[in-house]
């Protein structure tokens, strides 16, 4: 999950989330930044719902809606909470809260990618893209997201471009 939003007390959020995550025996990684949160966590539905409530009720992320999936085994070895100064590890002076594209729901996404004039660009790292990607998407083949601008700068943006 991720949520792009200003979080004034992101350091306190990381402490609160670490405390709650340990109490609920969660695993995975959570990043807290002034521009938002990012993470993938595993645990009981009850424990994960407590995290969602913490983010929505105590930190003003009212629009936060995580994506849920199920696993027969715990996919992570440990629980980590990390503080970062930036949500996106990219150079430059930009504000990801104000300067971002439009989010599309899954129904709209499927309609948009069906258009032959749409380019789908997979900006995830090599490990993630080896697991799978959308048919006919352009895979950036980067080791880290921070390497994406070198790849992305070579694309002519005169068509609709979808990033994931």
Where are these regions (language model features)?
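Cytosolic catalytic domains that perform sulfur/thiol-centered chemistry
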Residues: 1-164
């Amino acid at each position: 999950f991720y949520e792009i939003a200003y979080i004034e007390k992101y350091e306190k959020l990381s402490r609160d989330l670490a405390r709650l995550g340990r109490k609920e025996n969660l695993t995975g990684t959570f990043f807290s930044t002034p521009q938002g949160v990012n993470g993938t966590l595993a645990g009981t539905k009850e424990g994960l719902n407590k995290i969602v409530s913490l983010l929505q009720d105590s930190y003003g992320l009212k629009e936060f809606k995580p994506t849920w999936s199920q696993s027969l085994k715990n996919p992570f070895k440990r629980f980590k909470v990390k503080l970062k100064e930036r949500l996106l590890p990219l150079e430059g002076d930009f504000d990801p809260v104000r300067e971002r594209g439009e989010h599309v729901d899954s129904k709209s996404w499927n309609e948009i990618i069906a258009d032959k004039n749409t380019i789908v660009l997979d900006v995830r790292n090599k490990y993630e893209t080896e697991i799978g990607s959308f048919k006919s998407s352009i895979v950036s083949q980067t080791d880290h997201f921070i390497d994406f601008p070198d790849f992305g700068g070579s694309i002519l943006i005169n068509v609709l471009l979808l990033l994931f």
